[in-house]
Design a protein with these regions (language model features):
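Alpha/beta enzyme core
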Residues: 2-267
């Protein structure tokens, strides 16, 4: 069977059709393979892997070389979904030339597009230059984790009409610069609805309510890998933490009681 690849143009057309599309993070080959088989439309190698896969405190600690390794692994497991890589902190903020080079490295190892956080005149110019270079860009407004320190923590953005209008203004500028989609993170549902209705590119909700064109979650939250914390806007569809611990305990017991390996499990 021929598998039809999801492209940037596919995502753009979904906006006009009124349908929704799904986005999940993945950080390794097998997870990417399984969620691709499940029909997820966009797979994001999020810089959230800094915390979920590498144990860092924030996304600030992950670098280009690490993101390349994870991107290569994920891309190898995907046949259908659009593969997007989060550009890590300081990989694109210093100068246009190095930013294009770093983004290009992600494309070389298998990404179909990159995601860039924030808004400034520099960012607008960068998006334009990247698109001209042949690198599709997913923009990201609202709460932007790489700006955690300047935003004063994990705070909801766009709570007033003025703040919403400002996000919309920035979003329209990014749209004109060439971004093919926009993540809205931790934005009130009504604000995100207003922004979505006034853009021609699709919006992706990360805690921004149901009226965006797509929803994105971290795969670890969806799978239930952690019991300590789950964001308010996330939904658990499984209990992988309990499953993993149970399997490991049973293996440990079988080893220590001598029941593993059995005669059927040796040469």
């Amino acid at each position: 069977m021929v598998i039809k690849k999801v492209t940037v143009n596919t995502i753009k057309k979904i906006k006009n059709s009124g349908e929704k599309f799904s986005v999940l993070t993945a950080y390794d080959f097998s997870t990417a393979k399984y969620i691709d088989e499940a029909g997820i439309d966009v797979i994001l190698i999020g810089d959230s892997l800094a915390m979920t896969a590498l144990g860092y405190e924030t996304t600030h600690s992950v670098g280009v070389d690490e993101m390349k390794i994870f991107t290569r692994a994920v891309a190898k497991g995907v046949q259908r979904a659009l593969v997007v890589t989060d550009m890590p902190f300081l990989s694109y903020q210093t100068d246009i030339s190095s930013a294009i080079q770093n983004c290009g490295e992600m494309i070389k190892v298998g990404a179909n597009a990159v995601k860039i956080e924030g808004y400034s005149e520099y960012t607008l110019n960068l998006v334009k230059r990247l698109v001209e270079t042949g690198i599709p860009v997913m923009a990201h407004l609202g709460f932007t984790p790489q700006f955690l320190n300047t935003l004063g923590g994990y705070k909801i953005q766009g709570k007033t009409r003025e703040a919403t209008d400002e996000i919309l203004r920035q979003a329209k500028d990014l749209e004109l610069a060439g971004a093919f989609s926009l993540v809205l993170e931790m934005v009130p549902q009504d604000s995100a609805k207003y922004i979505t209705e006034n853009l021609s590119i699709p919006t992706i909700s990360c805690g921004a309510g149901k009226y965006c064109d797509a929803q994105v979650l971290v795969c670890d939250d969806v799978f239930g890998k952690y019991s300590e914390f789950t964001p308010k806007f996330a939904r658990k569809y499984g209990d992988m933490r309990t499953f993993i611990i149970d399997c490991a305990k049973r293996f440990d017991e079988d080893v220590k009681t001598g029941s593993f390996p059995s005669e059927n499990e040796v040469f």
